[in-house]
Every structure is written in structure tokens, then in C-alpha cells.
Amino acid sequence: MSAPARVLVVDDSATMRGLITAVLSSDPEVNVIGQAGDALEAREAIKRLNPDVLTLDIEMPNMNGLDFLEKIMTLRPMPVIMVSTMTHRGAEATLAALEIGAFDCVGKPAPGELRPFGDLAEKVKAAARTQRQYSQPVVAVAPPPSVADFRVGRKIVAIGSSTGGVEALIAVLQKFPANCPPTVITQHMPPTFTKSFAERLNRLCAPVVQEATDGARLEIGKIYLAPGGERHLQVSGASAPCCRLIDRAPVNGHRPSVDVLFDSVAELAGRNAVGVILTGMGRDGAAGLLKMRHAGARTLGQNEKTCVVYGMPRVAHELGAVEQQLPLSAIGEEILKMTAARKEGTE
């Protein structure tokens, strides 16, 4: 049995520090070794205690969590899980933190409600196990134009991701031209965060990126991100494919679930689809990707070396759902090769 993950909890609220500590301490594989109320205390505690993982509040006095995270990633890179308020402002800051190099994020619960912290211990343990090489922040690059040598076919692209997915999706989607194939995405994220993430992707990428709405028609040049929260994203409509937001219990512990999306794409599009599974904890999406492959779709998985967490892609690969495993840098271009029209009137 491996040693428990050693965690330092950083939050300016004593109540929140106590709550996070209590949640984490209920797991025997996690050891909270200290607490800090601001960046100065945290810096000294990191030197003294040498934690495996940090939980870090976004909003703190003196130096906010985002500025402190940048210093950590420069001076002492380590896995950091951001703890943020469930607001638009909190979501924007958290997305920036994930691009800087934070491992993952959780939303602060409302009074008397602990659900956002339900998987915190699992995220901490995954963070402690990761061999990730912490890197420089994602740099926005000029997106590719709509180019004459890319003619989109009739395929739908479906992508699933979780931990590490913010950076991974940016890397993939920045390869897409403005006339990309219709693309649907489920990324595990807290409610309110997905709208901000869609807006951020829309600024960084050539296609139109939007949070999916029920009934939104799938169109060339548009990317649809499943909203976090209470419903799953599916696609339906043989003659006019569109997004559907479905009320249903969580699948694999997630809502929205990648498996639910992939299952619907397999049923609707069959061989006229490409399925992609990116970095993430657990197994969500693996069975759905296998269903897509059995239906004739092309399928890709992110390789172990470039994953923040090689969980979802690993299970998919072991099931035989993945046609090709590729480094993150190659996935966007491969999707375009698989979806381009070969000649007039073909896919």
C-alpha cells in the first residue's frame, strides 16, 4: 500500500479550511499535514512540510490564488487543486489557473451542501500519483484560417475529457480551421464554469465555440460544449442533427457524462463520426468510445506521456476502443484528416 497523499490546505476562511480538512481526512489514503490562511503562510508551510498536493483558494488577501499559483509553478512546481466560488468571476479565474498549470478544480459548496467536494479526495490522490511535468502557461496562438485545402466532409466529431482537459482541448481545438466539422464535447466541470470555458475557447479558436443548448442544430464551423450541472449532452435527429440536453441520473458518477454523449453519436452517426478521448480520471467515455468504434466510427485516444491523468484513455485503450493513441500535439491534425472530404461528394 502506498503512503497517503500529503496535502496542504490553503484558504483565507477558517471555516472552509476546516471543511476541506474534514472531507479529506475521511479518506485513509489522504493526510492533511497543514493549513494556511494566505500566500505568505502557505509559502512557509510548503518549505517546512513539503506537501505532495496543495488545495488553493482563488480569492485570498495580500496575494490572490492566481498570482501565488504562478509563483509556485515557477519556483516549486507541484500539483495544485484550485477551490473556487461558483460564480462567473470565479470560473474565469479558475480557467486561467488551469492554463497556468493547476491540476484540477472544485467549486466551493453552498452553505449546508457538500456535493462539489464529493470527489475532492479522489482528485487529491490522482494529483499525488501523477508524474506530470509542469510546464509554462498555455499561450494563445493565432488560430488557423478557413483554408481552401480543407473541405469538411459529413462527419461529426465527439470529444470527451476530464482532469487536464482545459489545456488539452485548447491544444486540439486551436488546430481546427473556421470551417471545422460539427464538434460536440463533454468536459467534466462544475456548473457555471462551462459557459466561461466556452467563451474562452471562442476567443482562442477559429471556429465558433458555444455552450450547448437544447435543440441547437449541429453546423459546420461550430463547436458545442456540454453545460456542467444537471443534464447530459446527446445528439439526435437523422435529417437535422442537433444537441439535446437530457435529464438523467449521473453515469459513471458524472453529469454530463462522456459515455452518454458517445453512445448517442454512435447511434446517430455510425461510421460518419470521429470519437476522441482525452486526459482524465476514471473510465467515463471508454465504453461509449467502444460503441462508436463498433458502429464504424474512427477513434483516437491521448497517449500516456502527454496526459495529465492517463485514466479515461487507458481504460478505452484496454477495452479496444481506441484505433490510434497519439500525443496531444498530433490529435487536432489527425481529426481533420479523418473528417476531410476526400473528393467532391465523399467524406
From Swiss-Prot:
<comment type="similarity">
    <text>Belongs to the CheB family.</text>
</comment>
<feature type="domain" description="CheB-type methylesterase">
    <location>
        <begin position="150"/>
        <end position="342"/>
    </location>
</feature>
<feature type="active site">
    <location>
        <position position="188"/>
    </location>
</feature>
<protein>
    <recommendedName>
        <fullName>Protein-glutamate methylesterase/protein-glutamine glutaminase 1</fullName>
        <ecNumber>3.1.1.61</ecNumber>
        <ecNumber>3.5.1.44</ecNumber>
    </recommendedName>
</protein>
<dbReference type="GO" id="GO:0006935">
    <property type="term" value="P:chemotaxis"/>
</dbReference>
<keyword id="KW-0963">Cytoplasm</keyword>
<dbReference type="GO" id="GO:0000156">
    <property type="term" value="F:phosphorelay response regulator activity"/>
</dbReference>
<dbReference type="Pfam" id="PF00072">
    <property type="entry name" value="Response_reg"/>
</dbReference>
<dbReference type="InterPro" id="IPR001789">
    <property type="entry name" value="Sig_transdc_resp-reg_receiver"/>
</dbReference>
<dbReference type="InterPro" id="IPR000673">
    <property type="entry name" value="Sig_transdc_resp-reg_Me-estase"/>
</dbReference>
<dbReference type="InterPro" id="IPR011006">
    <property type="entry name" value="CheY-like_superfamily"/>
</dbReference>
<dbReference type="GO" id="GO:0008984">
    <property type="term" value="F:protein-glutamate methylesterase activity"/>
</dbReference>
<feature type="active site">
    <location>
        <position position="284"/>
    </location>
</feature>
<dbReference type="GO" id="GO:0005737">
    <property type="term" value="C:cytoplasm"/>
</dbReference>
<keyword id="KW-0597">Phosphoprotein</keyword>
<feature type="modified residue" description="4-aspartylphosphate">
    <location>
        <position position="57"/>
    </location>
</feature>
<dbReference type="InterPro" id="IPR035909">
    <property type="entry name" value="CheB_C"/>
</dbReference>
<dbReference type="GO" id="GO:0050568">
    <property type="term" value="F:protein-glutamine glutaminase activity"/>
</dbReference>
<dbReference type="InterPro" id="IPR008248">
    <property type="entry name" value="CheB-like"/>
</dbReference>
<feature type="domain" description="Response regulatory">
    <location>
        <begin position="6"/>
        <end position="123"/>
    </location>
</feature>
<keyword id="KW-0378">Hydrolase</keyword>
<feature type="active site">
    <location>
        <position position="162"/>
    </location>
</feature>
<comment type="function">
    <text>Involved in chemotaxis. Part of a chemotaxis signal transduction system that modulates chemotaxis in response to various stimuli. Catalyzes the demethylation of specific methylglutamate residues introduced into the chemoreceptors (methyl-accepting chemotaxis proteins or MCP) by CheR. Also mediates the irreversible deamidation of specific glutamine residues to glutamic acid.</text>
</comment>
<keyword id="KW-0145">Chemotaxis</keyword>
<dbReference type="Pfam" id="PF01339">
    <property type="entry name" value="CheB_methylest"/>
</dbReference>
